[in-house]
Amino acid sequence: MKLNATYIKIRDKWWGLPLFLPSLILPIFAHINTFAHISSGEVFLFYLPLALMISMMMFFSWAALPGIALGIFVRKYAELGFYETLSLTANFIIIIILCWGGYRVFTPRRNNVSHGDTRLISQRIFWQIVFPATLFLILFQFAAFVGLLASRENLVGVMPFNLGTLINYQALLVGNLIGVPLCYFIIRVVRNPFYLRSYYSQLKQQVDAKVTKKEFALWLLALGALLLLLCMPLNEKSTIFSTNYTLSLLLPLMMWGAMRYGYKLISLLWAVVLMISIHSYQNYIPIYPGYTTQLTITSSSYLVFSFIVNYMAVLATRQRAVVRRIQRLAYVDPVVHLPNVRALNRALRDAPWSALCYLRIPGMEMLVKNYGIMLRIQYKQKLSHWLSPLLEPGEDVYQLSGNDLALRLNTESHQERITALDSHLKQFRFFWDGMPMQPQIGVSYCYVRSPVNHIYLLLGELNTVAELSIVTNAPENMQRRGAMYLQRELKDKVAMMNRLQQALEHNHFFLMAQPITGMRGDVYHEILLRMKGENDELISPDSFLPVAHEFGLSSSIDMWVIEHTLQFMAENRAKMPAHRFAINLSPTSVCQARFPVEVSQLLAKYQIEAWQLIFEVTESNALTNVKQAQITLQHLQELGCQIAIDDFGTGYASYARLKNVNADLLKIDGSFIRNIVSNSLDYQIVASICHLARMKKMLVVAEYVENEEIREAVLSLGIDYMQGYLIGKPQPLIDTLNEIEPIRESA
């Protein structure tokens, strides 16, 4: 361990690995370098030392210079002598310093990342391939011309612009193009052998997921066959496949590999293939009168093929990485950063059996309205983190829209685990700005088998069962609660929602009216809404208004009723010039800030006076914003409309609410009026309500006046208005034209 720690400490020093690596690697590269003889002298076909020195400089920076100088002297001193070796060393050092400096200047950040990064392609092509090859050739030509490298004059020839120079230049470009990544890989492996494991892991990630072992084996077999053909010596039995035609076949084969297997594998494999091919060039390029030209063309093929293969490998790898990232992001909610419903569907598909849990948090809605959406985001994140220790591999918490979450569990002992999860949930504490918040969590679950074809329908059923869990304070099994009944109930809701939308679009609603008579002989009507069925039967509001409220259609229905009532009043202005109508409002409409503006616009459109409208409001816990509701009602009163509190005395409407309410009329709930004759307690309650209403200067309306005894009792209490079957039954709105006068006379 001490030896390893010491090695790690000194390996990047100038007297460590940088000092000895060039001396060790240059002799090996000397056997890989390939030379050819042409009419004008000797030329390079492949040259690696420059790529090694560029890689050393890029990796070790200034610490690489002593080792590079030492490596050149050790390798060339005996062959060239002191002065030529010194000149050659100066050439290399000038080149690599300029390349390294330019690259660092134009790529200041992350300049040493592994090769294959598309963001650095242009800088690396220029500073690590084109610029050093060009400068090396210029300095080499100059040194040979002035006599500093007299022994190497045969490598450059007398004239600088000839085929030999072009071949040398292409060889340097090819050597740098495939040699710099290769040398960089060798340096990293020598510096840290464990890098091989990391490299192999990255290599596997870059391979296309659809690649099979059989495909890869066939590809390697084809590649080996082409290499074997290139390495076979020419003879009288040789075919076209023993010529450089086979070299051209390498391109489509390597292109396929580049698109399928990734840059990490192809860059190394192509380097080996190209070095073997170039080293065996004499086997497929015969010597004949056009030998130099053919060698030049083949050398350019090495360069073009290398660039195409490497560039295609980089692009294909980058494209696969982008696609994988997009696919990964598609399964994660971008706000809460938890797996989404798509990820849940995939997990249910991959597992043969699963236990699906649903967590419903209804109290979160009010907290979000008061503290903002960040509370919900952090609550879900921390709740997911709280549940993570109880989850097995492959299980997860999934984000659902709104305030709910889902869990997928393995089926082993899922009943006991769900009970444990519920106990763990009850121990969860969430703090927001130092305040503890613990909304109740309802838990429902079911046992499902892959594939789950109707995930959204299933989640809707679990949501319904989770509401029962909030009441029972225990996890609820959907199968025991009757899945078929829940499915039918949910389908009926969806069907009713569609019918409501059709009714709004095609005016399939029907308005009825019930008279309300006053003690002084005045009469107004309450508008009652019905919906036409498929066979023109009338559907009562109890069947569709709860669905309308749940799916957010109640406000649209209210506006439909108001507009069609005003339209009726405008069309019959002559027959009923001062008649009033009472219209029921849903809690959603009352909580909308723009509702008074819309009412004002409709009144102006149909030229109806505001005092002719009475809006009946039921005070209930469905009022999501009580303050806004009070502002809306105040604006309606300022507009000239009257406000009536409906169904007073039951549920949410109580004496405590009466203290703060500001209305014009108070409608006593029919449950008190119905028994006012037979139940003295109901009589006293009604009397107290009337007394309080008079103190608030409100008129009182009695509902459910169904017989003469009730009517006499109501009159004795001094109630201002009466409504019920004794006064008049609900009739189509159009019939009110014929009922107004008889009702007034009877009153």
UniProtKB/Swiss-Prot annotation:
Mg(2+), and possibly also Mn(2+). It comes from the Bacteria. GO terms for biological process: cellular response to anoxia; cellular response to hydrogen peroxide; regulation of single-species biofilm formation. The keyword Cytoplasm does not apply. It is a multi-pass membrane protein. SMART domains: EAL (SM00052), GGDEF (SM00267). Residues 493-744 form the EAL domain. CDD domains: EAL. This is Cyclic di-GMP phosphodiesterase PdeF. It comes from Escherichia coli (strain K12). The gene is pdeF.
